[in-house]
């Protein structure tokens, strides 16, 4: 079964980032670049065999229910460009970067 980007929201974000390795894409519903990155990432996950140990999720900031996430992650207030990606390793932020692109993602996974 092909993998796809998981939906991360106020009810599951703690469990998601606590995974051994997880990439969280943060966006908004009215962000064309966020939608394009989601499509590109889903295409990548559909054929990827190397990064099966990594969870990939998307959080949509304007969907509501994210007060706890926002309070626990004060750095979010400084994010100026969406989409914004965060690589978590066992609940800790290991890397973060703005924008999309599978090549950039793979580079960060390989160098984490």
What are these regions (language model features)?
Residues 1-22, 105-112:
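N-terminal leader/targeting and pre-domain segments
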Residues 9-12, 42-43, 70-73:
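A generic local structural motif
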């Amino acid at each position: 079964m092909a993998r796809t980007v998981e939906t991360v929201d106020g009810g599951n974000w703690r469990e998601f980032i606590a995974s051994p390795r997880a990439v969280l894409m943060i966006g908004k519903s009215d962000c064309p670049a966020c939608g394009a990155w989601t499509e590109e990432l889903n295409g990548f996950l559909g054929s990827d065999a190397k990064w099966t140990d990594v969870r990939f999720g998307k959080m949509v900031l304007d969907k509501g229910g994210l007060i706890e996430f926002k309070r626990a992650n004060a750095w979010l207030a400084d994010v100026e460009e969406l989409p914004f990606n965060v690589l978590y390793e066992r609940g800790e932020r290991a890397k973060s970067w703005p924008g999309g692109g599978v090549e950039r993602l793979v580079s960060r996974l390989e160098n984490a």
